[in-house]
Each structure stands twice: as C-alpha cells, then as structure tokens.
C-alpha cells in the first residue's frame, strides 16, 4: 500500500482504518483508487487525482460538483426517494479547511468520496446502453432544471446541450464509421 496515497487520504475527514488502496477502473482523465477500510461497518472510499491540466480551475469544478450533488440529494430526499447514497456521490471534506479537495506539495489535486458498492461502468456501446445513457442524461438535466445556483464553465460548452446535440447531428450526418447506414 502506497504511503503517499495513505497520506493523501488521511487529509480527509473519513471513518475507518485504511487497510488497502488499489487502482480502480480504467479512467482516461483522472487517476482513481479504491480505499478499503478494515471495519465492515465503515464505508470504503474512492480517492481521485483530479487532472488539473484538463480542469485547471479545481475550485470551480468542486463548487459545481458540490452544488449539483447537494441539489440532487435534497430533491431526492424531498421526494422520499430510497437509497439516496446509491444515487448521488458524496464527497468528504478535508480535516484542515473543510474543502472538498486538497492540493499536495507536488501541485496535484485530490478528492475523496464514498465508494458505491456494486456500481458498474459499461465499457461497450450498444443500442440498449445508448438508450439508457440518453435516459440518464435526460433525468440528470431534469433534476437540475431548478438548481438555484449558477454553475461555472469548467470546459467550454461541456454542459451546453444545444452544442452537444449539434455535435451529435453532425456526426450522424457524417456517419464516420457506418453505424447510421447499418441502422437504416
């Protein structure tokens, strides 16, 4: 177990005793690790290095994430939705300043969240997964329709649905790998 990763994790206000830290998933942007705790009544965690080359304004990224997750969590609670902790990420504050991220001496940024057991990431794209992803994006947009705070733009046009739809329509027109032709 890496003492560096343990030291980073210990900056956060978490419960339990760290017994293992190992890579998690196949992410392309951030480095992600599962932090396992020794106690069965304590959660496991996800430790993630935020790629500050992709997201140079870490403060804004974490403000957005906090605003979005808090709003969705509150909306689900108001509707008495079950299993909220399985539906919404929960980030932990640091011990020293209460921020939802920490910056290390080497200039890297890290965050810690509760691990959602048995969550899966689909690696293959098929029509059923695409429909489910579309439904999920639609539900996400619907849940944020009444968010009371402004979100900052961390990547130009990243959350601009009109721009994303135009990109989709352009790709459908171009059909670069022949999928549209196959479906007709």
Question: Over which residues does each language-model region extend?
Answer:
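ATP-dependent phospho-/nucleotidyl transfer catalytic cores
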Residues: 22-26, 48-59, 116-131, 135, ...
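Conserved structural core of kinase catalytic domains
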Residues: 90-132
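Broad hydrophobic/π-residue packing in well-ordered secondary structure
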Residues: 11-15, 33, 108-116, 159-165
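Protein kinase-like catalytic domain
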Residues: 73, 141-148
